[in-house]
């Protein structure tokens, strides 16, 4: 009987804590308007920043392809900025 009481007590405590966590999540989470505003500020929504990210990714892929073709350690090449 003691085991059943412990299981029920533990289950109720777990459910209570989960309920409090869910309520706090709802209180802290941003509203619909705030989520839309945040979505507009993503880099993907800004064309100049998106173009810059594409350019940076192309440069990284170029270096990776170049390093795959040679046995040289690209990390030790100087200068790094070129």
UniProtKB/Swiss-Prot annotation:
Under the cellular component aspect of Gene Ontology, which terms does the record hold?
A: mitochondrial inner membrane
Q: Which domain of life is it from?
A: Eukaryota
Topological domain ranges for the Mitochondrial intermembrane compartment:
30-82
Molecular function (GO) terms listed?
Answer: cardiolipin binding; phosphatidic acid binding
**What Pfam families does its record include?**
UQCC3
| InterPro entries, per database record | UQCC3
Q: How does it sit in the membrane?
A: Single-pass membrane protein
Subcellular localization is given as:
Mitochondrion inner membrane
Q: Which residues lie on this side of the membrane: Mitochondrial matrix?
A: 1-6
Is Mitochondrion found in the keyword set? yes
> Which residues are listed as membrane-spanning?
7-29
Q: Which UniProt keywords apply?
A: ATP synthesis, Membrane, Mitochondrion, Mitochondrion inner membrane, Transmembrane, Transmembrane helix
Q: What task does this protein carry out?
A: Required for the assembly of the ubiquinol-cytochrome c reductase complex (mitochondrial respiratory chain complex III or cytochrome b-c1 complex), mediating cytochrome b recruitment and probably stabilization within the complex. Thereby, plays an important role in ATP production by mitochondria. Cardiolipin-binding protein, it may also control the cardiolipin composition of mitochondria membranes and their morphology.
Family per UniProt? Belongs to the UQCC3 family.
Q: How does it assemble?
A: Associates with the ubiquinol-cytochrome c reductase complex (mitochondrial respiratory chain complex III or cytochrome b-c1 complex).
Q: What is this protein called?
A: Ubiquinol-cytochrome-c reductase complex assembly factor 3
Q: What is the lineage of its organism?
A: Eukaryota, Metazoa, Chordata, Craniata, Vertebrata
Gene name of this polypeptide: uqcc3
């Amino acid at each position: 009987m003691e085991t059943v009481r412990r299981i029920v007590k533990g289950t109720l405590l777990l459910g209570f804590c989960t309920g409090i966590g869910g309520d706090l999540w709802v209180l802290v989470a941003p509203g619909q308007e705030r989520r839309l505003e945040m979505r507009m500020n993503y880099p993907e929504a800004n064309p100049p920043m998106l173009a810059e990210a594409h350019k940076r990714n192309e440069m990284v892929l170029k270096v990776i392809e170049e390093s795959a073709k040679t046995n040289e350690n690209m990390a030790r090449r100087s200068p790094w900025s070129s």
